[in-house]
Amino acid sequence: MSDQPYEYYVDIVTKRYFHGIDNGDMELVMGCFHPHASLREMSSNTLHDGYDAIREMFVGLFAAHSRIWHGNFVHTADTLECAICSQFSVEVTSIKTHQLVRYESCNRFYLEDGKIRSVFVYLSGENLLK
């Protein structure tokens, strides 16, 4: 059981994690992760295991896109299991092609000690999290 209230889960996901991604703020994004975190993109079964692997994945994501936006959030938090599921829209603009691509996504986050311990990412299109 979590000692964090429901609002904490929504805050770490929207005001820290996704806000950091949308603004290219690596320190803010990585500050959300537990030292032994993992991130798995489920459609391609791509695993980023560990803090350094996740950071490397975000370096690539930020380098490939001039704009990243997440919005239209719908959240369901389960404080007993220290988890939150977030559905949202994503827009990214490629630096290489200048093409805007829209996705729908759903992420399932599990927290430990107030940090993201594991996240499972479901994307409606190509895996951007290589």
What would you call each of these model-derived segments?
Residues 1-35:
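Short, low-complexity N-terminal intrinsically disordered segments enriched in polar/charged residues
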Residues 2-5, 55-130:
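A beta-strand edge to alpha-helix "cap/lid" segment located at domain peripheries
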Residues 22-25, 41, 78, 107:
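Acidic side chains
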Residues 23-26, 45-48, 95:
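Alpha-helix boundary/capping and short turn/kink residues
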Residues 25, 37, 66-69:
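Secondary-structure boundary/capping signal
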Residues 38-48, 60-64:
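A short gly/proline-enriched turn/hairpin at secondary-structure junctions
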